[in-house]
């Protein structure tokens, strides 16, 4: 092995019942570099990383760390050898302090008594934070931290294990641009110390900003590795999906119909104030804004998740009284939530069971479920949406993020709503699955659905929307037509600057 490499994974193969998750995959990471691992959801990235940190055992292949073959049997074994992973779904102990989370199970303690030396624990945490330029109180409760700060704590925890190799899974998926810059500063600092990072992302613009090399997997196979600065966007997409995607957004011309939903003066103290908008049949309205701008909160209030303090909602021209999500569903609404794992999926249930949670009463006759009808309808939608699963009885937690998201969309298609709210519909989803979901959204609009899309991805807002509503600190700052909407104009409004538009 070349001395340049801190890690080599060679000919890694892993099979599960009915599916070969990895087939002869390789990954080589140079010391002191950031190595991007990319591929569609279901390409094998997660399985490969789970093998590296000891969750799975490969059926074939070998792992070489610092020139020595390594057989990783447990997560603790991986940590002891200097390999740690920061997961996309953070799971801190919320009622413990920052310092206690970092050194959990390794707390400095008094001999015999077993009491934790709290002052020493806090001191070690402060020293770690100073090294990483992290400004967080070691005594703060984890439950009180933002997602970005939780992430910083996880990085500090990884460094506290003297990790030589850190895996970061979608580290920028839920943090602001300012927080991303801070994260990148820390990553560059770690590189200078000789730490290597495997960086899993779907955001192509991050490749040149922070990574040195890119490895692409597709359908459980190794496709190739190239220096990041030599990889064009088109080439990367071609490697990831196995086909060219010259245009992801093929927006068909759709006749815009009558107003399906009108919201007037919606207000919730501390969240949003005097928000008014409407969406018509066949129209896609994008909600843009920075994190914390109130976009999600407005949709949740319209959908009955929370109760507004003031405002009126009209559905098809008639005033609607919505006190619960059940009321919203009766009015023909559907909501794809922002966090599919936290508020969307029932992870212990099957794909089929997740698809029918909203419509289960429609399939009940004389107190019995119409299993054949359920199976037929779910199978039809699974084929229509290209949901990749060995069976509809497969537990949904085993599906890739993109396929989980499609199953949630299928849930609402079974309900057949007139008005559909899509909150971050492609978060954590690869480019191929995104294209499929965009096509589906356009088809829904073509069929007369009124659609509102909340997205933090600018190309998504610009590519999908007939109109763009921009929020800033709980207020509607402006509304742009498709022709008026540009990245610069949206960012101006999103940061609180007023601009002149036709409206």
Curated annotation (Swiss-Prot):
Catalytic activity annotation: D-ribose(out) + ATP + H2O = D-ribose(in) + ADP + phosphate + H(+); D-galactose(out) + ATP + H2O = D-galactose(in) + ADP + phosphate + H(+)
Principal EC category: translocase
Residue span, ABC transporter domain: 7-244, 254-498
Broad class of the protein's primary localization: membrane
SMART domains reported for this sequence: AAA
UniProt-recorded Gene Ontology molecular function terms: ABC-type D-ribose transporter activity; ATP binding; ATP hydrolysis activity
UniProt topology in membrane: Peripheral membrane protein
InterPro entries: AAA+_ATPase (IPR003593), ABC_carbohydrate_import_ATPase (IPR050107), ABC_transporter-like_ATP-bd (IPR003439), ABC_transporter-like_CS (IPR017871), P-loop_NTPase (IPR027417)
Protein EC: 7.5.2.11, 7.5.2.7
Residues binding ATP, per UniProt: 39-46
Keywords from the UniProt entry: ATP-binding, Cell membrane, Membrane, Nucleotide-binding, Repeat, Sugar transport, Translocase, Transport
Subcellular location: Cell membrane
Family: Belongs to the ABC transporter superfamily. Carbohydrate importer 2 (CUT2) (TC 3.A.1.2) family.
Role: Part of an ABC transporter complex involved in carbohydrate import. Could be involved in ribose, galactose and/or methyl galactoside import. Responsible for energy coupling to the transport system.
Protein name, entry field: Putative ribose/galactose/methyl galactoside import ATP-binding protein
Organism field: Geobacillus kaustophilus (strain HTA426)
